[in-house]
Amino acid sequence: MKLLENKVAIITGASSGIGRATARLFAEQGAAVIINARGAEALEDVASAIRQAGGRVHPVAGDVTVAETHARLTDAAMTVFGGLDIAVNNAGAVGATKPLAEISVEEWDHVITANLTSAFLGVRSQIPAMLKRGGGSVVFISSFVGTSAGIPGMAAYGTAKAALMGLVKGITADYAFKGVRANALLPGGVDTPMAGDAAQKEWAAGLHAMKRIAEPEELAQAALFLSSPMSSFVAGSALFADGGNAAVK
């Protein structure tokens, strides 16, 4: 039996990178997936690939910093596929990369909203739907930046990603006894457009004990673990998938 047979999942930031790899893997493992990104055309490309592979998918384009987008995602899960069991809140943005004192209030607000407020807006909509099914799994894509390591010029991003652990702990305290598990996945460098050019990827690889960055599919496998029955007693936790960065920093 497939790990996510008869499950329904929402995945944000699904048009590229970790989100796209996660959407395709979850569909392969039997889940019906509601996928989201801002760009409708790129999102439809992912949906088409999933359909061609025999998967069930429904794309919903929209900005995750807007509450109405999350309402549409959850409504689609309920009306198209009958409920919601899993949410992978992956969408985010690095934003301005400069020393902290040089960051404008507007730049700060953008990064916090894109990475933290968007996640709050997501779970505020997702959790009530999960409770109707007796529980579910929420996964936040955080980062090793701000949690195990500070990176020059990335104070805003690191702060936002570290704060996701506060959401994880709060959801666990409020809802774990009702069957909703929340966990964070903390990647190191990953070969995605967000990782930058070849020189930046080489620099990131040097931060990790494994001396390479991850493929998006490797992070999708970790997200699958946190979303599946394999992690049924894992709640309120941070799973580092950082190539050993936390061990050698």
Feature-to-residue mapping (PLM):
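Substrate-binding pocket helix/loop in short-chain dehydrogenase/reductase
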Residues: 98-100, 107-112, 204
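Alpha-helical segment proximal to the catalytic Tyr-Lys
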Residues: 128, 147, 169, 173-177, ...
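Active-site helix of classical SDR
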Residues: 123, 160, 168
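Residue(s) in the substrate-gating loop at a strand-loop-helix junction
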Residues: 143
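Short C-terminal tail/terminal secondary-structure segment
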Residues: 94-97, 224, 235-249
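Conserved glycine-rich cofactor-binding loop
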Residues: 8, 15-16
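A conserved structural motif in NAD(P)-dependent oxidoreductases
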Residues: 208-219, 230
